[in-house]
């Protein structure tokens, strides 16, 4: 099982047509220019958006680890979060959110199916990116197989930072690879 940290609907830059993009957690790279650093870690990560915080201290009060304090700069994490999710579940303004959730296959497919008509009419489909989706080849292949059974166009957006065997296994289950070339070194390439 792998975690998905975001689902972006009506995406137009992640493959042909209008798409639903699934963002998987975990990436072995640490690119300083990464657009999705919340996808680095394979585990859930608590995210804080200061401008959404109203200073109600609900998160401080419900945290069983006593990990959060309210300061003049907003909520401060003391560094011993267990990612239990109690603070994120109780935050009334979503200033605290958990990036990363396990999805049962039927629930994930139900989310994707919501946009079927738009995807079909636009020639779109589903794109899986990350993080680096090839870190979770078995789970990725399960998702791709299920999408294929349902007739969705399947795209994987990847750095290809994986073994040739993993790349081949995934390539057999999707119609398109989008490859992010992260760095070119003429001495190595």
Language model: regions and residue ranges:
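Iron-sulfur (Fe-S) cluster-binding modules
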Residues: 1
């Amino acid at each position: 099982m792998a975690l998905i940290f975001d689902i972006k609907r009506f995406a137009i830059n992640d493959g042909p047509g209008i798409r639903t993009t699934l963002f998987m957690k975990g990436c072995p790279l640490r690119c300083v220019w990464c657009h999705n650093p919340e996808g680095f870690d394979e585990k859930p990560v608590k995210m804080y958006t200061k401008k959404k915080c109203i200073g109600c201290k609900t998160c401080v009060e419900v945290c069983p680890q006593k990990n959060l304090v309210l300061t003049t700069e907003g909520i401060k994490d003391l560094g011993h979060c267990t990612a239990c999710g109690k603070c994120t579940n109780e935050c009334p303004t979503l200033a605290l959110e958990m990036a990363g959730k396990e999805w049962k296959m039927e629930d994930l497919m139900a989310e994707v199916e919501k946009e079927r008509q738009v995807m079909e009419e636009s020639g779109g489909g589903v794109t899986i990116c990350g993080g680096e989706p090839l870190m979770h080849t078995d789970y990725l292949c399960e998702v791709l197989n299920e999408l294929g059974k349902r007739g969705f166009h399947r795209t994987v957006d990847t750095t290809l930072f994986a073994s040739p065997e993993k790349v081949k296994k995934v390539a057999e289950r999707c119609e398109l690879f989008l490859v992010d070339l992260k760095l070119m070194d003429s001495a190595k390439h």
